[in-house]
């Protein structure tokens, strides 16, 4: 299956304010070695909030 050294692993994005895990996406480890942070819409908060990569 997927190894831990996969170049494009699946990650979960969690809202910064309410901590709900709203989005699942993939990222390229070579281009983005740090934890990803994107501003996306949170349906629980009802507004655009920063979402961070959760473990």
Swiss-Prot record:
PROSITE patterns given in the database record: RIBOSOMAL_L33
Query: Which InterPro entries does the annotation name?
Result: Ribosomal_bL33, Ribosomal_bL33_CS, Ribosomal_bL33_sf, Ribosomal_zn-bd
What protein name is recorded for this chain? Large ribosomal subunit protein bL33B
For this chain, the family text in UniProt reads: Belongs to the bacterial ribosomal protein bL33 family.
**GO molecular function term, any single one:** structural constituent of ribosome
This protein's source sits in the domain of life called: Bacteria
Recorded hits in PANTHER family, A to Z, give:
50S RIBOSOMAL PROTEIN L33, CHLOROPLASTIC, LARGE RIBOSOMAL SUBUNIT PROTEIN BL33C
Keyword annotations for this protein, in alphabetical order, are: Ribonucleoprotein, Ribosomal protein
What biological process terms from GO does the record include? Answer: translation
Q: Record's Gene Ontology CC terms?
A: cytoplasm; ribonucleoprotein complex; ribosome
Biological classification of the source: Bacteria, Bacillati, Actinomycetota, Actinomycetes, Mycobacteriales
């Amino acid at each position: 299956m997927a190894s831990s050294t996969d170049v494009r692993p699946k990650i979960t994005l969690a809202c910064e304010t309410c901590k709900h895990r709203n989005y699942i996406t993939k990222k390229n480890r070579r281009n983005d070695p740090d934890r990803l942070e994107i501003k996306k819409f949170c349906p629980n908060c009802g507004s655009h909030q920063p979402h961070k990569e959760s473990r």
